[in-house]
Structures are given as C-alpha cells and as structure tokens.
C-alpha cells in the first residue's frame, strides 16, 4: 500500500490526479474528508481522515503502508507536524518515506521554511527509515496569485529587482512524486527539480503578455511594500516575515537562479516552459474570453 498526504493542497492535489489518471491504487490522508469530495467516487482512491500533527489519529492511514509521500502545509509548526508523522510511520512499520521538501533546504539559507525543511530532512534521515528528499524550486503557480493586479492594472508587482528565478510547473513535480510513490527506488537520494529557464520578472511578464494577448509590465516594488501587501491580503505576519527573508535572499541570486534538468532526464519528463504554463492558465491571468 502507498500513502499520499497533503492531497488537497497545491502539490498534493496534482500528485493525486496523477494516480487517478493512471488508475493506480493509492490511499490519501486528509484532515477533512469534505475537501477530498472529488475523489470519493474514484475506485482506486481510499480516503482516510487523520491529522499529521496528532500521532494517535494516524494508525488507520499508516496500516499496511510500505511507502508514503509526506507533504504538509507550509506553516510555523511544520517541523513538529512532519516529525510526528515520521515517528508514527516508523512505529507502524512503514519502510520508505519520501519527503516533499524544497530546493532551499540548505544550511546557508536565511529563509525559515528552507531551514525547517532541512531540519525535517535530517530528522527523517536519522529515523532509520528509508528516505528520499524531493526538492523542487518555487512553483510557476505562485504567479497566479498576481492575477488580480495583472487583470486590473496590467502590472506584475513584485520585489525581485532584476534577479532571475527558475520556477517549475507543479504538474512536472507531481509526475516525479507519482513515480517515486508508485515505483519506489531512489533511496537515500536528494532529488532537485527546477524549471527549464532562469527568467527575470521582465521576461516572466513578457511571457504572460504573449499568453493573454495584452501587455503586462513588471513594476518593481520594495520588499517592505511586498510584505505589507501580503499582510493586507490576510497572510499572517510570521509567514509574511518568512517570505520577506526569501525575497531578500532571492535578490542575491544563487541556487534559485540556476537550471538543473538532471532529474527530468532520469525520469524522462518533458519540462514545461513558463510560456506553456501561462498559455494553459491564460484565463486565470485575465485573457479575454
């Protein structure tokens, strides 16, 4: 049996859809069954309710599981939540845990979530379980959050200066996550994934423009303006502060400005370009019907 957690989130839902499309049996762990209503009638999907942060709730989800892919919400309790899941997986006899981590899981980062991912990776590797760390870069889907200003003002307001980033389509990552869960292997491996291009925000705005058929301009703002905008949109201050540190780190360049297609070659996956992503999501970005 294989188990997928986080199946109602951004990445987890894409991975769940891969299982549905390929008709491969999978068990998914959700806190709220209602959020997985679209999967209720899929004969190859077993839905189990439980909370990754509450070990006592995880027995039914982990019973008979050989491999599990671990994803949880990016919040300030992520280390505690995922460590609890790792402990429960070990106690229930799970053999192999695949952690959905991040490219910024490294000791020299100042980004709190990168440091959290690294701490969890170390905990998993010390647990005695077989492990795999899947490390994608930031998602192209993050730019969909900018759709309101793109639609209203024809502007992409971000605090990223002239830096280049290597965003990846979540659907590409989901294909690798699916294959790791279905087939196993790649044990004690750290698997990086990036998009096929390192792009400035001007270049990203250009690709959105081409996809929707009207001009979108990149308008640089300050990191503090970005932080205040996040808070104004309901992002909790600790999360906004963490993202502020990520922005300041991205402005320095580094690993998120580099392209690495080695994982795609191993798994034989054709990378999605940002233009292809923008064309597929043109309506969301405000293209005329």
Language model regions located:
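Catalytic metal- and UDP-sugar-binding loop of GT-A-like glycosyltransferases, i.e.
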Residues: 71
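Oxidoreductase cofactor-interface core, primarily capturing Rossmann-like NAD(P)-dependent enzymes
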Residues: 1-39, 53-65, 74-83, 87-96, ...
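A hydrophobic C-terminal alpha-helical subdomain
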Residues: 14, 224-289
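Rossmann-fold cofactor-recognition segment
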Residues: 41-53
């Amino acid at each position: 049996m294989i188990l997928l957690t986080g199946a109602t989130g951004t990445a987890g839902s894409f991975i769940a859809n891969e299982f549905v499309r390929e008709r491969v049996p999978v068990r998914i762990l959700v806190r709220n069954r209602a959020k997985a209503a679209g999967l209720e009638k899929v004969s190859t999907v077993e839905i189990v309710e439980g909370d990754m942060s509450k070990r006592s709730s995880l027995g039914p989800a982990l019973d008979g599981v050989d491999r599990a892919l671990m994803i949880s919400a990016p919040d300030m309790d992520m280390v505690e939540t995922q460590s609890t899941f790792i402990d429960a997986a070990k106690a229930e006899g799970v053999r192999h845990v695949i952690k959905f981590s991040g490219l910024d899981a490294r000791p020299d980062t100042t980004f709190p979530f990168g440091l959290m991912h690294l701490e969890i990776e170390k905990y998993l590797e010390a647990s005695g379980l077989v492990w795999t760390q899947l490390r994608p870069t930031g998602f192209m889907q993050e730019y969909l959050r900018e759709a309101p200003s793109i639609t209203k003002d024809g502007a992409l307001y971000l605090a990223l200066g002239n830096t280049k980033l290597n965003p990846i389509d979540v659907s590409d990552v989901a294909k690798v996550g699916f294959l790791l869960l279905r087939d196993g292997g790649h044990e004690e491996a750290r698997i990086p994934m990036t998009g096929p291009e390192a792009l400035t925000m001007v270049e990203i705005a250009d690709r959105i423009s081409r996809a929707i058929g009207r001009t979108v301009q990149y308008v640089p703002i300050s990191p503090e303006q970005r932080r205040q905008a996040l808070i104004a949109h309901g992002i909790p201050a600790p999360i906004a502060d963490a993202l502020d540190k990520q922005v300041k780190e991205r402005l320095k360049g580094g690993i998120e400005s580099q392209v690495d297609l080695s994982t795609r070659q191993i798994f034989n996956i054709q990378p999605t370009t940002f233009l292809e992503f923008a064309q597929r999501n043109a309506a969301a970005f405000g293209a005329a019907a």
